[in-house]
Amino acid sequence: LPELLELDHINADTDNPDALEKKKKSTKLVITTVGPYQLHGEPIVKACVQAGTHCLDLTGEPKFVEHIYKHYNFPAERNQALIINSCGFDSVPADMGAFFTAQLLGEGDNKSIQSYVSAKGTFSGGTLKSAIGAFEDFSEEMIWDPKYKFGTETFEGIHRQKSIGKWAVPMPVVDPLIVSRSARARNDIYGNDFSYAQYFAVKQPLMVAGAFLGISVIMIATQIPILKQQLLNYKVSGQGPSKEERDKSFFKLVFIGKSSNKTVKTSVSGGD
C-alpha cells in the first residue's frame, strides 16, 4: 500500500516511547494493524495523542476500546487528535449499516435496529489472539454500562427471526459499543432512546446449539491457563489465511430497523 500511494516508510519500535513520539510528529495519521491491541496498542495511541496525530486501528477488543476511551478521550480532544477504533470487520459493516438503516427510518425517537450476521472466513494469528483476549475479558457490564452506552438495549436470547428465515444467537462483540457511540454523536440521525443488538444468523437449530456451545467453550477455555495457552499456540502472530481461503471468504449483515411508524430491512455484504 505505501508503494502504491507513493508514501515514505516510517519505522518505529512500539516498545520505545521516545522513538514513537518523534515518529508521530512527522505524520498526520497513524494506521496501526498490530494486535492484540491490549498488548501492543496503547503506546501508539499515547504517542499519537501527545503529538496531536490522528490514530486509526482495526481492534475488535472491547476492553481495549473502553480503556482508550476512558484514559485518552479528553487529552485527544485537547490536542485535536482523533482516535478511531475498530475500522476493520469490527466494526465498519455494523456501524455503516446501522447508520444507513437509521437514515431510512427518518426523523423521530425510539428507533431500534437488530443486525444478523452470516460470515465465512479464517482468523490470522494476531486476530485469533485478539479474539481470545476479548473473550477472556468480556464483561457485559463493561459493554452495556449506561454511563458509556447510549439508549437501552433490547437483546433477546436465542430466537427464530422469521423475516430472514434463520435462527439468531447473541454475539459478544464490540460492534454494539461502536454503534452506540455513533448514535450518541449523531442524535440527528438516530434520535433519542436508540437501541442496537447484534446476532449470529444460522439456518438450523443444530447449528444454533453448535454456535452457543462453541462460544461457551471458548469463554470457559480462556479462563483456564493450560487451555488458553493451547488456543494461543494454535496459530502464531503474522500467520494468516491463504489467498485461496480469502477468495472464499464472505460476510453479510441483515439489518431490521423499527420506529414508531416504520420498519425497514437493509443489508451490507462483501468478501475478504
Role assignments for model-derived ranges:
Residues P36, V45-V65:
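ADP-ribose/adenylate-binding Rossmann-like module
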Residues Q80, Q103-D272:
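C-terminal catalytic/substrate-binding lobe primarily of soluble NAD(P)-dependent oxidoreductases
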Residues P2-I10, N79-A81:
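A short helix-to-beta-strand connector/capping loop
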Residues K28-L29, H54, V264:
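Structural motif
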Residues D57, I83-N85, S115:
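General beta-strand structural signal in soluble alpha/beta enzymes
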Residues I10-L29, T33-H40:
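Conserved Rossmann-fold cofactor-binding substructure of NAD(P)-dependent oxidoreductases
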Residues P62-F64, G88-D95:
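Gly/Ser/Thr-rich loops at beta-strand to alpha-helix junctions
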Residues G41, T59-A81:
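Rossmann-fold NAD(P)-binding glycine/threonine-rich loop
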